Amino acid sequence: AGFAGDDAPRAVFPSIVGRPRHTGVMVGMGQKDAYVGDEAQSKRGILTLKYPIEHGIVSNWDDMEKIWHHTFYNELRVAPEEHPVLLTEAPLNPKANREKMTQIMFETFNTPAMYVAIQAVLSLYASGRTTGIVLDSGDGVSHTVPIYEGYALPHAILRLDLAGRDLTDHLMKILTERGYSFTTTAEREIVRDVK
């Protein structure tokens, strides 16, 4: 997350929401009902971690809203009603998801304006081109996206539900076969760090 005109993002953090596994464990620590991003990572031993984005598509809107709230108020420290917002989406994102993103931005955060762009198109723009093919492999999904004059060609986009999280799963399987135990979401994050 960041601001137009900056050379780099102001904030980079994982799209994770963590909730206490047991109530009362964090007494005296100003326990919150949910932790987001790096704070969730740092307390992962006593939290259950959830990923609101699966295979590049938002699957839990309440948690996604928490991530956006954290982005505006904790990371960027801005009032969202004072800034237009550029959101990115995965190629072939369902129209209903785009509508839900728009609804939350306007109705919950009162943004004055917003635009939703496909991640691969912005990657191509960053390289100074408007036509090309982008291979985008993230945590949950990989895409090859042909782009012509700034427009993704939906009929030619290829999607593969194989990405970083699958590599983590495979590494976890190999380590489990060697006698290591992974039962909590926190232990899964340790494997992710090893990867």
Curated annotation (Swiss-Prot):
Its EC number is 3.6.4.-. Keywords: ATP-binding, Cytoplasm, Cytoskeleton, Hydrolase, Nucleotide-binding. One of its GO terms (molecular function) is ATP binding. The keyword ATP-binding applies. It is found in: Cytoplasm, Cytoskeleton. Actins are highly conserved proteins that are involved in various types of cell motility and are ubiquitously expressed in all eukaryotic cells. Essential component of cell cytoskeleton; plays an important role in cytoplasmic streaming, cell shape determination, cell division, organelle movement and extension growth. This is Actin-85C. The gene is AC85C.
